[in-house]
Amino acid sequence: MLIKGTAGGPDPTIELSLKDNVDYWVLLDPVKQMLFLNSTGRVLDRDPPMNIHSIVVQVQCINKKVGTVIYHEVRIVVRDRNDNSPTFKHESYYATVNELTPVGTTIFTGFSGDNGATDIDDGPNGQIEYVIQYNPDDPTSNDTFEIPLMLTGNVVLRKRLNYEDKTRYFVIIQANDRAQNLNERRTTTTTLTVDILDGDDLGPMFLPCVLVPNTRDCRPLTYQAAIPELRTPEELNPIIVTPPIQAIDQDRNIQPPSDRPGILYSILVGTPEDYPRFFHMHPRTAELSLLEPVNRDFHQKFDLVIKAEQDNGHPLPAFASLHIEILDENNQSPYFTMSSYQGYILESAPVGATISDSLNLTSPLRIVALDKDIEDVS
């Protein structure tokens, strides 16, 4: 202070004292006209809960010569010090994202309002920025998500998701204040758990599925069936197929379950071309039925291609082969190719010697029997 007059010595001209000194934060040295902070046993804190932003006292000056009194107001402004770290309202945060969400979509806005991090410091020391940090326990998280606008903390999808590759991410998000000196900035972190929801991006697959090495593709699958010729549908239906025809949707965890598509089965193509006369496949159960008897004289086998597709307008079909063998009815008797046979052998031939078909004994005697059912030599 600089007040004209002296308050000390043998002949003082003024007398100085403090008025309205709340909580006695200020000490006065009247001789030196100096004010001191009285912080003995306590700390002057601008931040909550004390919230002392300024101290105002009145310096009373009495003119000892004429007896007049003058009051000087002194306002002491308490400047903020960056002595507090940000704190998150919650220990952790959670979000769910469908795997089909486009890149660039905002997937988390949970730091808006007072739901994110706060800092009780003032000015830049109390302003918050958010940034995603590398997580050694989930190394792909910081490449998959980003925070383009650090002041909002909104998390944006940076790369395409694939539920079949990864179903959960642990994203470490750091909050720091904006102190002008970067070395004085204080930080804290939280974890954002992001669960990936299964989307309808894969079609059905036939079972059993044997994977091609290092891929998600199934090896070609052939179902087998065999039916006797000339049998009626009533005798054979449903036709037994090995293994049973079954397909499942590769998107196995679409939520809610009511949104999961059903599977439709059908016969796509086949040989012989008249297969639709003989076989029908139930579109929902894949049950194979015979429509009319098959004569093996005209059809020995059928090779069909069957299809499984979704019923929701996103077909994404899968294909498999179905081989149907027509078995002989065994309605023909065997017969010999000759009515009689004559053979020759030496009288000295040992037991087990081969009988020949001529006197020179050069070739064995062949007895041939045929059966039209199997069209083979027996």
Give the positions of each predicted feature:
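Extracellular cadherin-type adhesion modules in metazoan precursor proteins
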Residues: 1-378
